Each structure stands twice: as C-alpha cells, then as structure tokens.
Amino acid sequence: MPQPPVVVALGGNAIAPPGGRNSVAAQFERTEETAWRLVHLADQPLLVTHGNGPQVGTALLRSDLAAEVVPAQPLDACVADTQGGMGYMLQQCLDNAFSAAGRRRPTVALVTRTVVALGDPAFEHPSKPIGGFYEEAEARRRMAADRWVMSEDAGRGWRRVVPSPEPVEIVEEEAIRDLLAAGVVVVAAGGAACRWCAGRTGR
C-alpha cells in the first residue's frame, strides 16, 4: 500500500504578515525559512498547499488601480496568478533547501481548480478576508466608490471579503496523486484552488 503523503499547509499571512515587509524579496526570505523546516520530510511523499489572502488582495488591488489602462482581472484569474507566483517561490526555496541538504527531489507547482456549485450561497455572502487592513473611514469610502464588500476583522481593522464556496471536487486530483507516486514534491491547491463552475467559462 502506498505511503500516505504528508500534507503541509502554509498560511498566506505567514508568508506576508500584516504590517510586515511584504515585497517579493521579503516573501522569498520567509518562504526559504519554511523550506528549511521541511527538509526532514524529504524521504516521504510531500504535498504543500498555501493560503493567499494577502497576496490575492494585492493582486486585486493592483488590477483595480490599473483598470483604466488594462482590463481588470476577475478573482479566479488573480487566484491563479498567486498560485503561480507563490508556487514558484516554494519550488525555488524547496529545491534550494533539499539540494543544500544533499536530498534533492523534483518539485512541481500545479495550478489547481476545484469544482463548486453555482448555487452555493457563499456567492451571495462573501466571507473570506483578503488583502490589507483599512481604517473604517477608508473602508467605507472603498465600499461606496469601488463597490468592494468589506467587513471588520477581529478588531484589527477592515478588510475586503470575497466569496469562498465549498469545493465539490479537485479537478487535478488524479494528476496530484500521480506526481506524488512518482516521488515529486507537489505544491497544489494554493488559496484553496481556483473555483470553477463546471460547464461555465471564466468566473
């Protein structure tokens, strides 16, 4: 019977903490620290997943600010962007850490989709906080001017919230299983994966 994989889940806030230095270089530094902590798992099937709250919030904000120059990006495309960028960081840092420890293994970051139900009530009731924190006055200005949905987050300030529908299945599940069986370290389902309503294109 195949050995079950070790699943490691990294929080998006751990890589880009509120109020911290969150440049790409700073996020690389934190990801590198994490990768070194995973070296002892090099002999086991290893699946790494990650959150993306701060990162996808930044991607949406960047899209909103540039909307007069280039077409705005929908949420699912921004999630895919963060899967690619954060997956790249994890690939690089895991490869470097494993190689330095003399335990080199192939690593693959996989853009992952989950099927969700079009009628999921989460679409009408956004609840997942993303991006940075705002003072109440700025949050209310954003809600009025930019039609953001925002809510107060545990006394720390206001944050943008987006829908988080329940996944029905992981589209790439078989590919993930095949990669793990082949000894590949897999980075997958970042940001809980890109939501996809079967039979529909885009959002």
Label the predicted regions:
Residues 1-49, 59-64, 178-183:
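N-terminal glycine-/serine-/threonine-rich phosphate-binding loop
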Residues 7-11, 49-50, 89, 106-113, ...:
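Short beta-strand segments
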Residues 11-13, 20, 52-54, 61, ...:
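Short, ordered loop/turn segments at secondary-structure junctions
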Residues 15, 185-203:
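Conserved mixed alpha/beta catalytic, RNA-binding, or beta-rich assembly cores of soluble enzyme
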Residues 18-20, 57-62, 119-125, 197-201:
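Short acidic, glycine/serine/threonine-rich loops at helix termini
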Residues 50-52, 198:
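Histidine-centered active-site/metal-ligand motif
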Residues 65-185:
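Ligand-binding beta-strand-loop-alpha-helix segment within the catalytic cores
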